[in-house]
C-alpha cells in the first residue's frame, strides 16, 4: 500500500501537467480571437465617418458698416454639419465661387472673398453717383451623398453693374475619408480617359449643331473637360458647363453618362461606394 502512494501522486502530477498543457492552446486561441475582434473594431471605428446632421444656416461673415443710401446686399446661406473638415471645405468653395463673380482666383477665406466683392462694388459706385451697389445671394446644399462621397451645389443670384445673374450653379465633389476635393480625372480609370473623351465630344458636337450661328463662331472645336464641374446622382456621373462658360453667349451644357457608361469609366472601388 505504501508503495502505491508515491505512484498515485506521480500519475496525479502527470495528469495535472497534461491538463495545464492542454489549456495553453485554448488560452492562446481566446487571446488571438480577442485581439482580432479588437483590431476589427478599431478599423471599423476608424472608417466610420461623423454623421453629417446637416443644418441650413447663414454663413459666418461680416459686412462693413455702410453710410451710403444704396448699400451692398450680400446673403450667403450655407450648410453646417458635424464634420468640421467638410464645413471648412464648403466655406472654401463658397469663397471660390464669390471670387469667380468678380474674375478673381486667389487663395482666400470666405470673409476675405466677401471683402474683395465689397471692394469691387465700392469701386463701381465711386465711378458714378447713381451706380447701384452689387447684390449677391448664395444658396448652398448637399445635392447628393453616398458613403464618403459628397456633392456640393452652390447657386448664385447676383446683380453686378448692368449684369444680372440668375440660377448659376457650381458643383464640387469631396471624399470625406481622404479629406480632399475630387476632379473628374481623379475618379476615372486612366485607361478609360480616351473613351470618356469620345463620349463627351460626341455630346458636344450634337450641342453645337443646335446653337445659333453666332455661338458656333465663338465656341472651341473641342471641349476641355478635365477641370470641368462634375456631379453624380442615383444613376451615374456627368459634367456641367454654366451659361457663358464655354463661350461668351453659349448656353448651359450638361452631359450625362448612363449607369453602364459610369460603371465602365469610374475606378471600381469608387463606383462601388458611389452607386
Model-derived features: where do they sit?
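Bacterial N-terminal signal peptides that target proteins for export
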Residues: 1-9
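Low-complexity, intrinsically disordered short peptide segments enriched in small/polar/basic residues
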Residues: 10-11, 184
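Compositionally biased intrinsically disordered regions enriched in Thr/Gly
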Residues: 23-275
